[in-house]
């Protein structure tokens, strides 16, 4: 099942997983297929990013962000990511992508995607930063405003030292990219 098939399956089963509560996890089960592997017969690097996308979309659907974004003219966007691979996911191996919204600050949201093998070991971890872009206003929306528009009254926890380091690194790399553009 390639990207579109996995996306369709995730969307068709989202209601069975119930509403997403900030602070909880999205868990999507997969098997490493022949279309997922590289020449080492394990999940290729690009596939990790695509599967993390599915975890994010699952959260966005279940929290109501997709519907809200369409009404408001907003667009959820990823700004960057950092990944680390600690175990390989071999062909035919079962695994889960466990995704969560960790915290936010201003217009920036930190997400986490763990790739968990069927024996409970973490195979990879991806941290993401993103935001919600207001197309009509041509600006990013403060995440507290997004949370309020979703009818939630959740406050973010302070970023951990690792998350703060990631945010700072991302901002530095983003500045570098804008200089060379």
Task: Please place each PLM-identified region on the residue numbering.
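Short amphipathic
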Residues: 23-33
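Acidic, divalent-cation-chelating loop motifs in proteins
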Residues: 36-38
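Charged, low-complexity intrinsically disordered boundary/linker segments
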Residues: 71-78
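HotDog/MaoC-like acyl-thioester-processing domains
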Residues: 1-16, 22, 89-96, 100-181
């Amino acid at each position: 099942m390639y990207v579109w098939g996995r996306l369709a399956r995730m969307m068709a089963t989202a209601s069975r997983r119930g509403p997403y509560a900030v602070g909880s996890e999205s868990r999507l089960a997969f098997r490493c297929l022949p279309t997922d592997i590289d020449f080492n017969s394990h999940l290729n690097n690009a596939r990790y990013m695509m599967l993390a996308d599915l975890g994010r979309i699952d959260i966005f659907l279940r929290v109501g962000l997709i519907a809200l974004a369409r009404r408001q003219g907003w667009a959820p966007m990823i700004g960057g990511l950092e990944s680390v691979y600690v175990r390989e996911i071999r062909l035919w191996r079962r695994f889960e992508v466990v995704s969560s919204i960790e915290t936010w600050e201003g217009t920036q949201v930190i997400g986490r995607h763990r790739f968990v093998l069927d024996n409970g070991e973490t195979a990879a971890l991806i941290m993401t930063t993103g935001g919600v872009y207001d197309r009509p206003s041509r600006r990013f929306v403060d995440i507290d405003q997004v949370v309020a528009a979703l009818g939630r009254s959740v406050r973010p926890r302070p970023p951990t030292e690792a998350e703060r380091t990631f945010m700072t690194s991302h901002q530095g790399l983003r500045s570098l990219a804008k200089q060379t553009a």
